[in-house]
Amino acid sequence: MNNIIEINDITVPELDVYARTSEVQLLRYYEPKPGLFIAESPKVIERALNAGYEPLSFLVEHKDLEGEAKQILERYPKIPVYTAEYDVLVGMTGYALARGMLCAMKRRRLPSVEEICQNTSRIAILENVVNPTNIGAIFRSAAALHMDAVLLTSGCSDPLYRRAARVSMGTVFQIPWTYF
């Protein structure tokens, strides 16, 4: 892999999306177009990639370059992979990485309610669920219950927030959803 970049300076601008940009700022990163989100853990990243989301960069704990992350990284030889030891990454991000890997990805335009509801028979409707952990758990349950789609009111937390996507184990990328 020739796209590995050792992190020696955690203040470089390329790492801002991982360390110094809030979830809300990521959401609005390219306004008025869809912004960014951070996927955490190889399983969640793999599901996002399989759903067609575009990676911008990866942040990987050095010891995990040869672990679960390796197969994902080999598929994207031109995408930058920033890496450092555990202590450096925790100091930069403020938390331990789940399974040692993060990925900055571009959001996509959300489908309309009409597009979501077309050819569906089982839809979960979420009203004002503000906790990202709860959003993730509900999406995971919706997947287990074979829901065709999820509709969220504008008062709901974003399913692509890092914690919501991680708790859902990536099912937010497998079940169609939108706000109404």
Name what the model sees in each region.
Residues 1-69, 156-157:
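Boundary-proximal intrinsically disordered activation/regulatory segments immediately upstream
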Residues 4-11, 80-85, 176-180:
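Short acidic-hydrophobic, aromatic-tinged amphipathic segments that line or gate anion-handling sites
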Residues 33-36, 54-58, 78-80, 148-150, ...:
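Short active-site oxyanion
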Residues 47, 68, 91, 134, ...:
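Phosphate- and divalent-cation-binding pockets in alpha/beta enzyme and binding domains
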Residues 71-76, 167-171:
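Short, conserved catalytic or adaptor-binding loops enriched in Gly and charged residues
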Residues 73-94, 178:
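A glycine-rich helix N-cap at a beta->alpha junction
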Residues 103:
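Glycine-rich phosphate-binding loops that contact phosphosugars or nucleotide phosphates
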Residues 109-180:
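RNA substrate-binding interface of SAM-dependent RNA methyltransferases
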